[in-house]
Amino acid sequence: MHCKILGLPVQEGTGRKGCNMGPDSYRAAGIADAIRELGHECTDLGNLAPAAQRPLQHPNHAIKALPYAVAWIEAISEAAYRESAEGFPIFLGGDHLLAAGTVPGIARRAAEKGRKQFVLWLDAHTDFHTLETTTSGNLHGTPVAYYTGQKGFEGYFPKLAAPIDPHNVCMLGIRSVDPAEREAVKKTEVIVYDMRLIDEHGVAALLRRFLERVKAEDGLLHVSLDVDFLDPSIAPAVGTTVPGGATFREAHLIMEMLHDSGLVTSLDLVELNPFLDERGRTAAVMVDLMASLLGRSVMDRPTISY
């Protein structure tokens, strides 16, 4: 398989600086070597730059860096569309705003192929705010609402060529949801498996249910993995830590199941903030998880000291 890694040094979607260093942190953690050691071809496409900014102002004055955020979304969407034509694109973040570009880009490509696009959202948060409902103004909390075609983005974010059907989005590991997001998600068919459901039923049963549906509908699956999906005890390098996240074992099980399914066609690695890391610990964990998704099994995975 030909893996293509593209750095998306976005930090305008979050209230803390540092995510722009994420792509190079993954490189320093050996992401390309990890891919090649599994027998895959790896091409590093470097880091993307945002499109030209244009003046934009929204009535919600809490919103931060709207022109710059939109410039990033435009550039990322085109890049994701281009790189999803062939091979396996891996998008290195950068904060989760980048998914407002990656998902629309790959969904546009899927629509041209006549295939349904599915998204597995591995995150502590639903990221289902609109420009009108966000109170923090941090636009990394808006991608899912945007790419599923919710109202409130018209005239600001780019028009979607192929909105994702909300029922084709599965959120796994959710444990922090704002009231406005909760009400908005309840009005859709987005599949939400929060940590209580994981505790009650186990992550394998819940994930298997979603993967069976993706397979039955001959879908393409994009995985968007946020550092804060993981418990901060194993992945501290994120500005939005929420206790009670996925364990190292749960996360690897998910990645191995995804590999076994053969359904995953693209991947986001997001919200890594090296400024908050401990000697590269989180970057190493994320690279290790990616390797499991690409085929590294327990029997041949080298032991790494984090």
From Swiss-Prot:
GO molecular function: arginase activity; manganese ion binding
CDD domains noted in UniProt: Arginase (cd09989)
Keywords recorded for this protein, A-Z: Arginine metabolism, Hydrolase, Manganese, Metal-binding
Positions annotated to bind Mn(2+) 1: H96, D123, D127, D226
GO CC terms of this entry: cytoplasm
UniProt remark on cofactor binding: Binds 2 manganese ions per subunit.
Pathway: Nitrogen metabolism; urea cycle; L-ornithine and urea from L-arginine: step 1/1
EC number: 3.5.3.1
Class of the enzyme per the UniProt entry, highest EC level: hydrolase
Binding sites annotated in the UniProt record for substrate: H125, T126, D127, F128, H129, S136, G137, N138, D178, T240, E271
Family: Belongs to the arginase family.
The protein's name: Arginase
Organism in which the protein naturally occurs: Brucella melitensis biotype 1 (strain ATCC 23456 / CCUG 17765 / NCTC 10094 / 16M)
